[in-house]
Amino acid sequence: MEDGGKHFVFVHGLGHGAWCWYRVVAALRAAGHRATALDMAAAGAHPARADEVGSLEEYSRPLLDAVAAAAPGERLVLVGHSLGGLSLALAMERFPDKVAAAVFLAACMPAAGKHMGITLEEFMRRIKPDFFMDSKTIVLNTNQEPRTAVLLGPKLLAEKLYNRSPPEDLTLATMLVRPGTNYIDDPIMKDETLLTEGNYGSVKRVFLVAMDDASSDEEMQRWTIDLSPGVEVEELAGADHMAMCSKPRELCDLLLRIAAKYD
């Protein structure tokens, strides 16, 4: 990393992995910055199975460990996509001094003083019964109460997530997605005292609106933003839900502007 370079840490959404950030990571590294894309537990190339990960905390452990391990004085730019916003929130609450800025890309962005699951619950309330299309629900074999995961189907990926992305990225996704859980029934999602103004609320937040998102539409994204007055808002014109694939250059430019603003 060149002198003055930033360290960006990326967190994927449901069913995806570090692999979905490959275009953005390559561009940022070429520009002299450090870029780390993580696999959450039981996602991407992470060795755990979905039935072995019982909570949002366990799922987010790779991010929490990475932020905890940041060098003294190093302040990270965290970037979370979709469900990855919930993992960002946990890291921000726990390590606010280690985060220069948190970027929520068409993401679940909780509000300080409200329960963690508020935006995810609203999203689930808004979607139609057939939203998940050809996705498959998988019953997980656990020692706890029965839980389910979803394997995103090729049709859903094509029509709701990658609808403006290159066909190569859609093909890659159909090969690499894994069953994922949103942890909406995790007790932590109901805790209204978890995210505080003093920690989570003290970190600079930027919400990036994917303007052509066919999954979490603009109205839902604006609803999320309205929960947190004062959050900076940027727009990615022509971006589908997978903005890192459909608009990688524009996303990189925005991230560099954000990183330069919040040091």
Curated annotation (Swiss-Prot):
The keyword Ligase does not apply. Keywords: Hydrolase, Serine esterase. It comes from the Eukaryota. Its EC number is 3.1.-.-. The active site is at S82, D213, H241. InterPro entries: AB_hydrolase_1, AB_hydrolase_fold, MES/HNL. PROSITE patterns: LIPASE_SER. Signal peptide: none annotated. Pfam families: Abhydrolase_6. GO terms for biological process: jasmonic acid metabolic process; salicylic acid metabolic process. It is an enzyme of class 3 (hydrolase). GO terms for molecular function: methyl indole-3-acetate esterase activity; methyl jasmonate esterase activity; methyl salicylate esterase activity. Belongs to the AB hydrolase superfamily. This is Probable esterase PIR7A. It comes from Oryza sativa subsp. indica. The lineage of its organism: Eukaryota, Viridiplantae, Streptophyta, Embryophyta, Tracheophyta. The gene is PIR7A.
